[in-house]
Amino acid sequence: MQGLLRNVAPKRFYFEDALITTHNHDFVNDPAFRKAYNRGLKASRGKNSHNQWRVYLALWAARVCSKIEGDFIECGVNYGVTSSAVMEHLEWDKLGKQFWLVDSFSGIDERQTTDEERKSGALETNEVSKRDGYYNCDIERVRQNFSQWKSARVVQGWIPECLNQVTASKVAFMHIDLNSAVPEIQAFKHFLPKLSPGAFILLDDYAYVGFDVTFAEWNKVGRELGFEILALPTGQGLIHIR
């Protein structure tokens, strides 16, 4: 398939993170994007690479939300790839906003995994991810990474217990990437009353392969609360607050 596409459109071929397209993706060569993306890679020190379109979507949503009243929140920071890219892209300390960076830095919360997630191997994946360094468990490394910005606030703890440490009165943007349905939805519901009109919530795992439980649970909440989720070909999901 890759060979065929390269023959059909050799100058317009994108294949990364399970996304294949021959449509325009000139953003990958944009200097502003490259600078932001490379800052994200610096945070990961080689982990979590090859996800340019995911980061591109985060940068787009963050740019829109930078003009909206409220702070930014990331639930599920890991190494800080996406949030570092966003902060670099927006010249963060010039915005007058706080970026709240919430994570256990201990993998997923096993107490909150559903029966379906356990059956799909979530606990085993959690242990392997911690062992192999896909999940970052070194909070000091994270603090060092974000020391570049005065308006970055690292919050360590389990969701929802730690969320009272986030003192934002308004929220303009959320990036949720907890790899577990229950705490993702708890975080969303906690901050829902504080979301400003026009805010975006970017869900990292919503439509991603292997996250069927997350997809179903988010759709259920969407029906209950009356909002739509846009499924993106990257596996992400996007919610717009009106």
Describe every region a protein language model picked out:
Residues 23-52, 59, 67-242:
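S-adenosylmethionine/decaboxylated-SAM
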Residues 1-20:
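N-terminal auxiliary segments of SAM/dcSAM-dependent transferases
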